[in-house]
A protein has these predicted regions:
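Short internal beta-strands
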Residues: 14-23
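Core dinuclear metal-dependent hydrolase active-site scaffold
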Residues: 3, 44-102, 202-205
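Short acidic-hydrophobic, aromatic-tinged amphipathic segments that line or gate anion-handling sites
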Residues: 40-45, 193-194
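Active-site metal-binding loops of divalent metal-dependent hydrolases
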Residues: 21-22, 61-64, 84-88, 107-109, ...
Length: 205
């Protein structure tokens, strides 16, 4: 996911915020070894920090990577959550993401497409495991636990090119919300799907 970072930093020297485990792994990559040490800013899970007037709140997630994290951002009393690359969620994850005004949430795969697709068995098991990725169904069930009247935008992201379709992710998430034990229906909130190779439209919260 970060192989293009070295190219970006040749043009702009900007700080790199990441957990200690992620930084150590990055420093081992040939394409990133030239990055000056002082550009790395270590992030600690559960320790909030600020970048100018934006509060950043990292949180631990379950994924088979080098100390991955999800993030919440607060500015002017508004909260935005970014939650991708996780194989499962628990009460802690739900509690952390409650009260968001907008959220970008992983809806990585359709289970049926993955199971019948061409991926090798070990990779299918990795994706379906607790340190893999959220399916469309799990994404919808997670959303049903954090929805509230103030939720302004839901963006589904990190869709698999091989094992998902934008319309399928959208409809499955809406259906899961409608079927859940909640007062809300799937069409009560604006849900969009982030495109792989295009910039999403501006969203105001």
């Amino acid at each position: 996911h970060i192989s293009g970072l070295g190219v970006l930093l040749k043009k702009r020297e900007i700080p790199i915020y990441a957990t200690g485990g992620t930084i150590r792994k990055m420093r081992q990559m040939d394409c990133l070894r030239h990055i000056p040490e002082d550009l790395f800013q270590e992030v600690r899970e559960e320790e909030h920090f600020t970048i100018k007037d934006v509060l950043v709140a990292p949180m631990q997630i379950s994924h088979d990577a080098a100390q991955p994290a999800a993030y919440r951002f607060r500015h002017d009393k508004k909260w935005v959550g970014v939650l991708t690359d996780l194989g499962m969620y628990n009460d802690y994850t739900v509690e952390c993401m409650r009260g968001m005004d907008a959220i970008l949430l992983e809806a990585n795969h359709d289970v049926r497409m993955l199971e019948t697709g061409r991926y090798p068995y070990y990779l299918k098991q990795r994706i379906l495991g607790e340190r893999g990725h959220l399916s469309n169904e799990l994404s919808g069930r997670f959303l049903s636990r954090i929805l509230h009247d103030g939720m302004k935008a839901i963006i589904l992201g990190h869709l698999s090119q091989e094992n998902n379709l934008a319309e399928l992710a959208y409809e499955t998430v809406r259906l899961e919300i409608s079927m859940a034990d909640t007062v809300y229906q799937g069409n009560d909130f604006p849900i969009s799907v982030a495109k792989r190779s295009e910039v999403s439209e501006m969203i105001e919260v």
